[in-house]
Amino acid sequence: GFGALFKFLAKKVAKTVAKQAAKQGAKYVVNKQME
């Protein structure tokens, strides 16, 4: 049903966002250590 599809999409989006956040976080940490 529609609910299942929505849940599936929400999970995919959450995973993608988490990946992006991890990348940004890693960049931030590296930049901080470079200072």
Swiss-Prot record:
<dbReference type="GO" id="GO:0042742">
    <property type="term" value="P:defense response to bacterium"/>
</dbReference>
<comment type="subunit">
    <text>Monomer. Interacts with CSTX-1 (AC P81694), CSTX-9 (AC P58604), and CSTX-13 (AC P83919).</text>
</comment>
<comment type="similarity">
    <text>Belongs to the cationic peptide 04 (cupiennin) family. 01 subfamily.</text>
</comment>
<keyword id="KW-0354">Hemolysis</keyword>
<dbReference type="Pfam" id="PF17563">
    <property type="entry name" value="Cu"/>
</dbReference>
<comment type="function">
    <text>Has antimicrobial activity against B.subtilis, E.coli, E.faecalis, P.denitrificans, P.aeruginosa, P.putida, S.aureus, and S.epidermidis. Shows insecticidal and hemolytic activities. Probably acts by disturbing membrane function with its amphipathic structure. Synergistically increases the insecticidal activity of CSTX-1 (AC P81694), CSTX-9 (AC P58604), and CSTX-13 (AC P83919) by up to 65%. Also inhibits the formation of nitric oxide by neuronal nitric oxide synthase.</text>
</comment>
<dbReference type="GO" id="GO:0005576">
    <property type="term" value="C:extracellular region"/>
</dbReference>
<keyword id="KW-0528">Neurotoxin</keyword>
<dbReference type="GO" id="GO:0031640">
    <property type="term" value="P:killing of cells of another organism"/>
</dbReference>
<dbReference type="InterPro" id="IPR035164">
    <property type="entry name" value="Cupiennin"/>
</dbReference>
<keyword id="KW-0964">Secreted</keyword>
<keyword id="KW-0929">Antimicrobial</keyword>
<dbReference type="GO" id="GO:0090729">
    <property type="term" value="F:toxin activity"/>
</dbReference>
<protein>
    <recommendedName>
        <fullName>Cupiennin-1a</fullName>
    </recommendedName>
</protein>
<keyword id="KW-0800">Toxin</keyword>
<feature type="modified residue" description="Glutamic acid 1-amide">
    <location>
        <position position="35"/>
    </location>
</feature>
<keyword id="KW-0044">Antibiotic</keyword>
<keyword id="KW-0027">Amidation</keyword>
<keyword id="KW-0204">Cytolysis</keyword>
